[in-house]
């Protein structure tokens, strides 16, 4: 049994010998292989260190060829039996768990890896050592390795470890499990920022919640105004162009009606024109005095409605009596005997802020329905008066409204009003002429106290220098202020200027 196997190995391991000596090969056909090997006396013995395990195949199957070995290797040497070591191979699967386990133990996709790819997943150090050896049980090794590395409860083990190789599904499951516990104490912590206890009992959170609700109801107008300012500032940051309008003789005809200059310029009946102007003036002061506290605020004029909002403490004004609070806009009352009643004092400024807050509420409520401030008779009278003025002025306001509405329709543009009229009468005038929807109250400025140029500076500081400003007016004040700030100025002197302005806006020149 040993001799035929040695004969086969000799033929495989000596291919060159048969090529170099053909006559010897022919002669060997008549002789037995065992005799040819035994008569070889020229063999020089070599030490066992000259041979590696790669030269000796330990495979039990003779028909599977090993890697060709050196032609100087002979199976008849005595060291052959001592170099065959099979025990290290038998314990190989247990020894490889130290480096075979880490690449696979943390993976949750074990079922997706085929068994035939086990060798590709062995570390580089192990592959280097395997390449120099010829293991007889590669397939068995791969199967044993996967069986040792993938227990049936691999998902549970991986979920409990804090491995960086967690899958997205497992991470999402862990987040959903921990999220409720992380969010539960948050409301109590936010409600009690000044509480010394880290985790207040639930019995303490209920009264504090009621206190928060009450505090929310009594929230100061300063904070409300700040939030409104923040909301408007976010909208202002998106603006690209701001149109600064004058009111009288630009959008509406009012002052020239009172003086009769309009009737003289356009050949109208002075009596009718002046009478219409006086009637409109009467309505303006009626609304200003009755609903907008002009009697109290005439001597306390402001440039903008929010100028005194910082003095408002947010008191509920539902049942507040403005007629009996002792406020005097012309100066302090000597009967108080303290600084709180003096003009500019804390109490006086607070009452002043109350009035401007109420003015804003009334304006916002009636900006699209000024008739709600008037009796039915006065409402009808206002409608007739506006129609008469529109006829007398040849649709001046209607022509200006075309440009105003076109600008308002643009998302990146805004209309801002700067007038030399005091703030409260200007608000009444805007409401009565039906311009409340065009000009929000925060976009209305009075230049009575500080002048047009200073108003322009405030507007530039609000909207920024990156915005393009276009000034539209009829007077020298607007023109000079526009030149000071390098703003283009569009002069309005007649109907043709309004028509040209609308055409320029339609063609996107402005």
Swiss-Prot record:
Residues 7-16 have a biased composition (Polar residues). Its main location: cytoplasm. The active site is at 246 (nucleophile), 248 (proton donor). Binds 1 Mg(2+) ion per subunit. Mg(2+) binds at residues 246, 248, 474. GO terms for molecular function: chromatin binding; histone H2AXY142 phosphatase activity; metal ion binding; protein tyrosine phosphatase activity; protein tyrosine/serine/threonine phosphatase activity. It comes from Mus musculus. This is Protein phosphatase EYA3. Its cofactor is Mg(2+). It comes from the Eukaryota. NCBIfam families: EYA-cons_domain. Interacts with SIX1 and DACH1, and probably SIX2, SIX4 and SIX5. Expressed in branchial arches, CNS and developing eye. InterPro entries: EYA (IPR028472), EYA_dom (IPR006545), EYA_dom_metazoan (IPR042577), EYA_dom_sf (IPR038102). The gene is Eya3.
């Amino acid at each position: 049994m040993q001799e035929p196997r040695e004969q086969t190995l000799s033929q495989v391991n000596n291919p060159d010998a048969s090529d170099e000596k053909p006559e010897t090969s022919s002669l060997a056909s008549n002789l037995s292989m065992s005799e040819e090997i035994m008569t070889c006396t020229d063999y020089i013995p070599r030490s066992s260190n000259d041979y590696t395990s790669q030269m000796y195949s330990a495979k039990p199957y003779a028909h599977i060829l090993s890697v060709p070995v050196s032609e100087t290797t002979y199976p008849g040497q005595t060291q052959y039996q001592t170099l065959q070591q099979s025990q290290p191979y038998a314990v190989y699967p247990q020894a490889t768990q130290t480096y075979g386990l880490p690449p696979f133990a943390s993976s949750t996709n074990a079922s997706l890896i085929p068994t035939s790819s086990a060798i590709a997943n062995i570390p580089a150090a192990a592959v280097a050592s395997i390449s120099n050896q010829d293991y007889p049980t590669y397939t068995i090794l791969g199967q044993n390795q996967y069986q040792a590395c993938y227990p049936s409860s691999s998902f549970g083990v991986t979920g409990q470890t804090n491995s960086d190789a967690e899958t997205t599904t497992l991470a999402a499951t862990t987040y959903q499990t921990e999220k409720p516990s992380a969010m539960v104490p948050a409301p109590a912590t936010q409600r009690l920022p000044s509480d010394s206890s880290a985790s207040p009992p639930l019995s303490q959170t209920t009264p504090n919640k009621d206190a928060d609700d009450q505090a929310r109801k009594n929230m100061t107008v300063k904070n409300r105004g700040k939030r409104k300012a923040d909301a408007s500032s976010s909208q202002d940051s998106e603006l690209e162009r701001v149109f600064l309008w004058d009111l009288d003789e630009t959008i509406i005809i009012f002052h020239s009606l009172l003086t009769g200059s309009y009737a003289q310029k356009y050949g109208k009946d002075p009596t009718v024109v002046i009478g219409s102007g006086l009637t409109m003036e009467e309505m303006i002061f009626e609304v200003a005095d009755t609903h907008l506290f002009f009697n109290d605020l005439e001597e306390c004029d402001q440039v903008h409605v929010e100028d005194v909002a910082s003095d408002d403490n947010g008191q509920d004004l539902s049942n507040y009596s403005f007629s009996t609070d002792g406020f005097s806009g012309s100066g302090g009352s000597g009967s108080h005997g303290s600084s709180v009643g003096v003009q500019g004092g804390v109490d006086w400024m607070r009452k002043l802020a109350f009035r401007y807050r109420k003015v804003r509420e009334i304006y916002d409520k009636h900006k699209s329905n000024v008739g709600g401030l008037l009796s039915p008779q006065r409402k009808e009278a206002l409608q007739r008066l506006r129609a008469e003025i529109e006829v007398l002025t040849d649709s001046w306001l209607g022509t200006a409204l075309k440009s105003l509405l076109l600008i308002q329709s643009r998302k990146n543009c805004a209309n801002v009003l700067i007038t030399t009229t005091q703030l409260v009468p200007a608000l009444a005038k805007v409401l009565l002429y039906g311009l409340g929807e065009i000009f929000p109250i925060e976009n209305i400025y009075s230049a009575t106290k500080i002048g047009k140029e200073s108003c322009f500076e405030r507007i530039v500081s609000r909207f920024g220098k990156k915005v393009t400003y276009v000034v539209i007016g009829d007077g020298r004040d607007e023109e000079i202020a526009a030149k000071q700030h390098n703003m283009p100025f569009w002069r309005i002197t007649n109907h043709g200027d309004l028509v040209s302005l609308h055409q320029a806006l339609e063609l996107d020149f402005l």
